[in-house]
């Protein structure tokens, strides 16, 4: 009995669900019926408006052409009537002269004949008939105003509803990825002069090959493109690839999307490894800010344990020119934080080959700031540039302003304005580490070295802050400088 009731309950539940689905579908059908009526009325109204526009245009053209015929007729009529009137007057004068001549010839009075003959001769000389052109001033031919609308009639007969545009074809051979920009080029398989604009959609992905149906990243949309190419600028390549697709639109409808394509967007992506940072550095994703109170509690405990009453001196303090005596002879074996005067934080991604580029903007009021690379073995007490395991550019605004390149506890003063944005270019296999003005791409300094271990991006700051920008490609201008040998001419072998 209970089993039957349970089975009946399941049937009731199934029926209820099905009824709800049917009701929802009925509502959808009713809504579609309303939409059909509304959309039909709209397209009918649009059609009538278009034809009315054609009628108005044809009527306007007709009136203009009729006016041209009337004006031409009036002009010719005027000329011909004037010429006709002149000829009529000349004929009347000539007939009068002829009659006078005949009468004179028949006259019997020979005494007056010479005088009369002379007058007739003078009258003939001055007669309008002999000064009149007997050629019509205008033609009666109106063929230049004839029309033949056979071609236009065929065009009108071909009027129909707008066709759905074909799907564009993306041309990968003409498309380009460079300088954190993507230029996408496409073409239409067939000529279509009804296309009004194109719509481009793109999204980021970490998957190579054809785009997948389901992606975590949404499609980004760019509308109103009038040409068959478009350039996306200022991109951050924080994923390995990008998917693209394009569709064409006319006034009424859009066509199908093109076959999606995937372009590789190679760039160096990393995050700051907060587990390595000095306790006085507050790390937030790619931003770092000096926090004077960050390690206060730990410092107090350390002083109580060691029985020492002094605190650590600032980085690069004249009183602390040598590494801390607490520095361990061996490199860091785990993920220990930097400590003492090494106000350092590392990136979380190793560089073991290829070319990579990133930029960092630091607060100009920072008392000290450094950027470069380091081996993973850099000791937790070691400062950037003061051992053979790190290379950096260092800005010091404390007591005395300096801008130096540092490696293996050696420094070279740089004769260049200190930019607020520094670009770092690392060519691992070539053993080149170059620093640039991030805004102008002016080369500041290049280290030449033989890297024996994978590198990590490294940063240091004291009483200041900075922000790192990753996902950048090696700029074309940087590649050109390196190819021209500018890097070699700017290097300092004493620091390598």
From Swiss-Prot:
PANTHER family: E3 UBIQUITIN-PROTEIN LIGASE TRIM36-RELATED (PTHR24099), FIBRONECTIN TYPE III AND SPRY DOMAIN-CONTAINING PROTEIN 1 (PTHR24099:SF4)
The UniProt record lists the keyword Cytoplasm: yes
Organism from which the protein derives: Bos taurus (Bovine)
Coiled coil spans: 4-99
Protein known as: Fibronectin type III and SPRY domain-containing protein 1
Any Gene Ontology CC annotation: nucleus
Subunit structure comment from the entry: Oligomerization is required for binding to microtubules.
Chain positions found as Omega-N-methylarginine: 310, 320
Gene: FSD1
Keywords: Cell cycle, Cell division, Coiled coil, Cytoplasm, Cytoskeleton, Methylation, Microtubule, Mitosis, Nucleus
InterPro entries (alphabetical): B30.2/SPRY, B30.2/SPRY_sf, Bbox_C, Butyrophylin_SPRY, ConA-like_dom_sf, COS_domain, E3_ligase_FN3/SPRY, FN3_dom
CDD domains found in the cross-reference section: FN3 (cd00063), SPRY_PRY_FSD1 (cd12901)
């Amino acid at each position: 009995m209970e089993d039957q009731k349970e089975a009946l309950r399941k049937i009731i539940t199934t029926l209820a669900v099905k009824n709800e689905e049917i009701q929802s579908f009925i509502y959808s059908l009713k809504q579609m019926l309303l939409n059909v009526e509304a959309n039909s009325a709209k397209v009918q109204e649009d059609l009538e408006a278009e034809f009315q526009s054609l009628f108005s245009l044809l009527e306007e053209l007709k009136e203009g052409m009729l006016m041209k015929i009337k004006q031409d007729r009036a002009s010719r009529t005027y000329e011909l009537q004037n010429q006709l009137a002149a000829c009529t007057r000349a004929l009347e004068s000539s007939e009068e002269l002829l009659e006078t001549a005949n009468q004179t010839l028949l006259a019997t009075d020979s005494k007056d004949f010479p005088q009369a003959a002379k007058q007739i001769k003078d009258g003939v000389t001055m007669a309008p008939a002999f000064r009149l052109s007997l050629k019509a001033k205008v033609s009666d031919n109106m063929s230049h105003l004839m029309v033949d609308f056979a071609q236009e009639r065929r065009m009108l007969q071909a009027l129909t509803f707008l066709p759905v545009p074909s799907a564009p074809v993306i041309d990968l051979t003409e498309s380009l990825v460079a300088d954190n920009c993507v230029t996408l080029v496409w073409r239409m398989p067939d000529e279509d002069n009804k296309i009004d604009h194109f719509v481009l959609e793109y999204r980021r992905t970490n998957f190579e090959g054809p785009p997948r149906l389901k992606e975590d990243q949404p499609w980004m949309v760019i509308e109103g493109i009038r040409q068959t190419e478009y350039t996306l600028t200022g991109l951050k390549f924080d994923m390995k690839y990008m998917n693209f697709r394009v569709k064409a639109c006319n006034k009424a409808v859009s066509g199908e999307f093109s076959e999606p394509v995937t372009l590789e967007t190679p760039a160096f992506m990393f995050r700051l490894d907060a587990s390595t940072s000095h306790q006085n550095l507050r790390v937030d994703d790619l931003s770092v800010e000096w926090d004077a109170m960050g390690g206060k509690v730990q410092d107090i405990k350390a002083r109580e344990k060691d029985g020492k009453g002094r605190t650590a001196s600032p980085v690069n303090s004249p009183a602390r020119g040598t590494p801390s005596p607490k520095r361990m002879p061996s490199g860091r074996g785990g993920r220990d934080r930097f400590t003492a005067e090494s106000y350092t934080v590392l990136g979380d991604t190793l560089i073991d080959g290829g070319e990579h580029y990133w930029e960092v903007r630091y607060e100009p009021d920072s008392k000290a700031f450094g950027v470069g690379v380091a081996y993973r073995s850099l000791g937790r007490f070691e400062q950037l540039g003061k051992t053979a395991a790190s290379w950096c550019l260092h800005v010091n605004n404390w007591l005395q302003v300096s801008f130096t390149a540092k490696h293996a506890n050696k420094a070279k003063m740089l004769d260049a304005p200190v930019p607020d944005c520094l670009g770092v270019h690392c060519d691992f296999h070539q053993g080149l580490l170059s620093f640039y003005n991030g805004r102008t791409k002016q080369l500041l300094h290049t280290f030449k070295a033989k890297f024996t271990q994978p590198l990590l991006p490294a940063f240091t700051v004291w009483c200041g802050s900075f922000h790192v920008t990753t996902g950048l490609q090696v700029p074309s201008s940087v590649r050109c400088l390196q190819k021209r040998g500018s890097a070699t001419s700017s290097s300092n072998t004493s620091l390598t």
